Regions:
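Acetyl-CoA-dependent GNAT
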Residues: 27-74, 80-85
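Conserved catalytic-core motifs of GNAT/GCN5-like acyltransferases
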Residues: 127-147
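Short hydrophobic/aromatic beta-strand or adjacent loop that forms the aromatic wall/cage
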Residues: 47, 147-151
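Conserved beta-strand-loop-alpha-helix junction that forms the acyl-donor binding cleft
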Residues: 108-126, 139-140
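A short, well-structured alpha-helix characteristic of acyl/acetyltransferase catalytic modules
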Residues: 1-40, 147, 158-160
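Conserved acetyl-CoA-binding loop-helix of GNAT-fold acetyltransferases
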Residues: 85-102, 118-119
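Conserved beta strand-loop-helix elements of the APE1-like EEP
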Residues: 152-157
Length: 160
């Protein structure tokens, strides 16, 4: 279930800090930096931040995205699972993305190649006749291996 992230602000920060200097953090940030989201006490109309919780209200993930209302575009998605393999995280992510595909003209998101969620993103993108762009060898990871940047876009022609 999605809850406003402000309700779990401190817990989200602590969970994110556990992943500093890891590949999981690289997949979240898209580079070698570490990151803790700045969760707004009073969110504006452009940024949406959610805690993903299970039926016991236990924090299992974090989801954020931005909206460009003028362009009718949802973008800048960020997802972090604190409970690897928990299907609720994927269910909530793709449920929200599905909602946004039908509400806006365009949604776009990026990821680092090799991210375990890539096949799920590919299926979701294909379901809505989206496009996957690959920027080959876009940066080097901590092991000096090249990684691709992948950009997904889905255009809903009915929402212009």
């Amino acid at each position: 279930m999605l809850k406003p992230a402000i309700m779990y602000k401190d817990e989200i920060k602590k969970q994110m800090q556990k992943y500093f200097y890891t590949d999981d953090m690289m997949y979240e940030v898209g580079e070698l930096d570490n990151y803790v989201p700045e969760i707004a006490d009073e969110p504006d109309r452009y940024c949406f931040q959610y805690a993903i919780v299970d039926s016991n209200e236990k924090l299992i993930g974090y989801l954020a995205y931005a909206i460009d209302w003028h362009a009718s575009c949802a973008y800048n998605f960020g997802l972090f699972s604190f409970d690897r393999g928990n299907p609720i995280v994927g269910k909530e992510l793709f449920g929200k993305m599905e909602e946004l595909v039908h509400k806006f003209h365009r949604i776009e998101w990026r990821m680092v190649g090799g991210n375990p969620v890539e096949k799920s993103y590919d299926r979701f993108c294909a379901k809505y006749n989206g496009t996957k762009h690959i920027l080959k060898d876009a940066f080097k990871d901590r092991n000096c291996e090249y990684r691709d940047y992948i950009i997904y876009e889905i255009i809903n022609e009915e929402n212009k």
